[in-house]
Amino acid sequence: MSNTPIELKGSSFTLSVVHLHDANPEVIRQALEDKIAQAPAFLRHAPVVVNIASIEEEVEWRAINEAIAATGLRIMGVSGCKIPRLKTEIDRAGIPLLTEGKEKASRPAPSEPTPPPPVASQITKTRLIDQPVRSGQRIYAPHCDLIVTNHVSAGAELIADGNIHVYGMMRGRALAGAGGDRDAQIFCTHLAAELVSIAGEYWLSDNIPAEFYGKAARLRLGESALAIQPLN
């Protein structure tokens, strides 16, 4: 047992991000309820981050907050806020204002070219799972790809910030690009997933085209939706 009453440790959690493109609270509520109805087991009472980068007009945060809360979603934070008054309103509501990892503070250009890092530092590790992934298990591969060389049961969940490869029957949920990488892909030799997701865009099993169900397939993210093709 630790001698200290508390301990702070770094960790990573996968959260869905709700990108708002309309400031009307009723429109937001209805759109969210429609999404939740498509995947209630995945989204009902889910913790989410709300991105309001597309909202440039003056809005009342309280009304938007109440509309989202009415759907059962739980707001863990708000990102992309560019309006000072709105930032103050969100902060007073006790909701954290988040800065997305891809945002970087501007800095002057270096006077000389920066030498490339050593080759070893450019290598991205891959998490490899050889055992079957059983129902109820959740496997997360932060900042790398995930490869499973066995079957994935229904009720199991694979999450990776990079690509996901499954060399076996894929019956569970696969969430690639969990950190927002829209170039991530999913590769399966036998696709029968409950849910597939890339950077927050997802399909339920009913959305998977029948001609690909149970077959070898490759999924990627198009301009605004998932796309699928045979895995050769």
Curated annotation (Swiss-Prot):
One of its GO terms (biological process) is division septum assembly. It holds the Pfam family MinC_N. Residues 99-124 are annotated as: Disordered. Residues 110-119 have a biased composition (Pro residues). Keywords: Cell cycle, Cell division, Septation. Belongs to the MinC family. Interacts with MinD and FtsZ. Cell division inhibitor that blocks the formation of polar Z ring septums. Rapidly oscillates between the poles of the cell to destabilize FtsZ filaments that have formed before they mature into polar Z rings. Prevents FtsZ polymerization. PANTHER family: SEPTUM SITE-DETERMINING PROTEIN MINC. This is Probable septum site-determining protein MinC. It comes from Klebsiella pneumoniae subsp. pneumoniae (strain ATCC 700721 / MGH 78578). The lineage of its organism: Bacteria, Pseudomonadati, Pseudomonadota, Gammaproteobacteria, Enterobacterales. The gene is minC.
